[in-house]
Amino acid sequence: MKIRKLMSTVYGMLMSSFLALVLVPTHVFSDETCMSPYMAKIVGQEDYVYVWTLGQVGTGDEQDKLVTIAVNPASPHYGNVIGHTSVGGRNEAHHSGFTDDRHYLWAATLDTGKIFIFDVHTNPAKPKLHKVITDFTKASGGIVGPHTTYALPG
């Protein structure tokens, strides 16, 4: 009986391993992932990545901010923070997304319901705060804490 149970266990383990090898791809290929199907395809190396960050008490200026990092390996600043744009306060920074032309980055917040719009096109290394939507909760009929922004055509 013990041998039969052992054989059953070994068989189960072998079948699990076989199925894992057959069903799980060993190479994964992907194309550019975009926020919107209407967004222009990114061609070539990105120069910067924008990180929408939370302000924290006792750290820096304690404000939410958009941080710019150089990501082009050819840049002498590769892998370094090259700038940041504070938004004046802590709003529980959350998700962000590009407009379909990638000229603006919309950054949502949870606590205040504000939406910050950054111009990342005029000078990509030094984004500027373009506009702040402060009445989203009222204008949307009471929706609080927009989670994700999404670019639609037009």
Question: Model regions: which residues?
Answer:
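N-terminal secretory signal peptides that target proteins for export/translocation
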Residues: 1-11
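Intrinsically disordered, low-complexity Ser/Thr- and Pro-rich stretches
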Residues: 3-4, 24, 93, 109
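Bacterial N-terminal signal peptides
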Residues: 9-27
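Beta-strand-rich domains and repeat architectures in extracellular enzymes and scaffolds
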Residues: 31-71, 78-110
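Short glycine/serine/proline-enriched coil/turn segments at secondary-structure junctions
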Residues: 57-60, 76, 124, 141
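Short loop/turn segments immediately following beta-strands, especially the blade-tip
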Residues: 69-77, 117-127
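Loop/turn residues immediately N-terminal
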Residues: 112-114
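Asp-box/WD-like beta-propeller blade repeats and closely related beta-sheet repeat scaffolds
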Residues: 120-154
